[in-house]
Amino acid sequence: MAKIMIQGTASSVGKSLIVAALCRIFKQDGYSVCPFKSQNMSLNSYITLDGKEMGRAQVLQAYAAGLEPEAYMNPILLKPTSDKKSQIIVNGKVYGNSTAMEYHNLKIKFKDMLKEQFEKLEEDFDIVVMEGAGSPAEINLRDRDIVNMGMAELVDAPVLLVGDIDKGGVFASLAGTMLLLNEGEKERVKGTIINKFRGDVEILKPGLDMLEDIIHIPCLGVVPYTRLQLEDEDGAVEFNKKAYAPIDIAVIKMPHISNFTDLDALKSEEDVSIRFVTSKEEFKEPDLLIIPGSKNTIEDLLYLRQCGLEERIKEYSREGKIIGICGGYQVLGSKIKDPYKVETDLGEIDGLNLLDMETTFEKEKVTTRVSAKLLNEETKNTVYGYEIHMGISKYGENIKPLFKIYDKNGEKVDYFDGAINEKGNVMGTYIHGVFDGVVFREKIINELRVKKGLKKKKSQMYEHMREKELDKLADIVRQSLDMEKIYSIIGMK
């Protein structure tokens, strides 16, 4: 089996999309290929068909490789719960919570498991494309590294180093990274990639030659800055501004926002503009307000209270349309109870009281794939998605369920999910990915269109658009990189 690892000079330099592009290129060239990231830190996660949790970046990479996402592609997932603590997911299941120092001491225990997971891939695939995290030049973490050079050494993988020229200082970041690597690590780096370049490459070439003279490693290509409608896992980036988009959707950007990839399918609607809101001044008068998921619902509820957004949301709810997803759904209720101190020591807290329901946090985490029917007069078509939450919500009298779940991880079930108020303008659900399918997204956006005097439209399947964008990404990267050299590095040609 061939393998190659993509590392970067820093976070958000484009490692994940370079890996996705290589997965698609190798697949197009007839090879069976699999992505692998030993450890990922993200608040955007996904539930596999067998109910396991993994990072969203490896989900996109799996699709690029033509595979169903599986937790073995991302054996360790760290989900920050506060500035100092993270929930640790190992092989798709909750391992526990720990501080950074506690986890640093735990990493040695995971090394054998990671090697074993990787060796299984060697039996099933022609090529494995690995992804590092952050930078390999974090010299304070070198002795227990399991995600960058430590992982590359564990499985004897060659490395390509990616730098982001759009931020500026790409030559310094590449040269500085190489300077901080030890001799064995330097020998693993077989090439560099300049990512997110704007302009004429000819102007850049003298710098590339000088860099090669300094670090003695060839540049394998310059990838242009390109806007793609593919999900971003690393951070809640600003959405592309459209010249004219009559439908204005505001999203509350809470401190612990998670699974904001739920919004990606909405971006595919040509007449929809999405913007983040962090203050009363930014709120304005949107056509729809979305309160997204949260990794610490209680702290984010306190944030809404303290910054004045709670008052503005309640005022907007008199006439405006609101959708809460997972943690955003929980804050819409009358009360949140935390008897086991899952999130804080508060015990319980009043919600926004826009939906007649109460949520209680349990010890066990719900991670499940679901299929549901939308309960309304117009349609009973299926909605697909997944649930990731600690809370159980109970309805009051002045509320109706939004969905009926009929399939859970492949088993037939029969229970309600979500809620909608009597007026029909405030609703919420535990289902992540609820907008990915056409049914719910088309219904909601068409309601907004009609209210503004616009014609209804058919929504496109998000997965079809994603496939086109992945092919576009692969074409750009194939044209930009020396693929013959990359095949030579991995010993395939």
UniProtKB/Swiss-Prot annotation:
Disulfide bonds: none annotated. Residues 246-440 form the GATase cobBQ-type domain. GO terms for biological process: cobalamin biosynthetic process. CDD domains: CobQ_N, GATase1_CobQ. Pathway: Cofactor biosynthesis; adenosylcobalamin biosynthesis. Keywords: Cobalamin biosynthesis, Glutamine amidotransferase. GO terms for molecular function: ABC-type vitamin B12 transporter activity; catalytic activity. Coiled coil: none annotated. The active site is at C326, H432. Pfam families: CbiA (PF01656), GATase_3 (PF07685). Catalyzes amidations at positions B, D, E, and G on adenosylcobyrinic A,C-diamide. NH(2) groups are provided by glutamine, and one molecule of ATP is hydrogenolyzed for each amidation. Belongs to the CobB/CobQ family. CobQ subfamily. This is Cobyric acid synthase.
